[in-house]
């Protein structure tokens, strides 16, 4: 059930764009075939996003091709340690043409805990999921907190939130978020220093 919720959450994070023509599709896996669609301002580039949820030896990947705003392209890539040995990772590839090159996913680093932690949470249909302690590893010294919602005709208003450890703060902010014609809203993008674990 956790994987089902996560897959749904990954699809929500990638907003549909609506004056360039780009390929449009979503799928579970590494690639998808779709149809060409006109983009509208501020979505001015074509993009391909690969998303992955990894937990221990298991992983699920999804692919999304769409129109994007240049601000989304600045993210490039992200790796969020959501705790419980689980990661959500993304690779964003933007280009002038419909075909975009992939950025491969490297293997997860075998990093050790670094003495810091962040609130960890992953929620769908809620902005206030129960938090747990996500133990940061390696170079992860920042805490990320993203909250938003997306309106669909069915099932309606879908809320989501994501919290965990990251190595650096993303360039994404509320000021450059894509609102997708009042369908997709980022309500909070917060990044701050991780919390040091208490000494035993």
Swiss-Prot record:
Q: Which residues form the signal peptide?
A: 1-19
**GO CC, alphabetical:** extracellular region
Summarizing the function annotation, the protein's role is: Inhibits the PLA2 activity of crotoxin (CTX) by replacing the acid subunit (CA) in the CTX complex. Displays a pro-inflammatory action through activation of important main signaling pathways for human leukocytes, in vitro. Abolishes both the muscle-paralyzing and muscle-damaging activities of CTX in mice phrenic nerve-diaphragm muscle preparations.
Protein name, entry field: Phospholipase A2 inhibitor CNF
Q: Does the keyword Endoplasmic reticulum apply?
A: no
Q: Which proteins does it associate with, and in what oligomeric form?
A: Occurs as a mixture of oligomers. Tetrameric arrangement appears to be the predominant quaternary structure. Interacts with phospholipase A2 crotoxin basic subunit CBd; the interaction leads to dissociation of the CA-CB heterodimer and to inhibition of PLA2 activity of the CB subunit.
In its keyword annotation, does this UniProt entry include Nucleotide-binding? no
Q: Which family does it belong to?
A: Belongs to the CNF-like-inhibitor family.
Highest taxon listed in the record's lineage = Eukaryota
In its record, the post-translational modification comment is:
The carbohydrate moiety increases the inhibition capacity of CNF, but is not essential for activity and for oligomerization.
For this chain, one GO molecular function annotation is: phospholipase A2 inhibitor activity
Quote the subcellular location field of this record: Secreted
| Chain positions carrying an annotated carbohydrate | 176
Disulfide bonds, paired cysteine numbers: 22-46, 25-32, 39-67, 73-94, 95-100, 118-143, 136-165, 169-191
Tissue expression, per UniProt?
Expressed by the liver.
Instruction: Give the SUPFAM superfamilies listed for this entry.
Output: Snake toxin-like
Q: Which organism is it from?
A: Crotalus durissus terrificus
InterPro entries found in the cross-reference section: CNF-like_PLA2_Inhibitor (IPR050918), LY6_UPA_recep-like (IPR016054), PLipase_A2-inh_b-type (IPR016338), PLipase_A2_inh_N (IPR004126), Snake_toxin-like_sf (IPR045860)
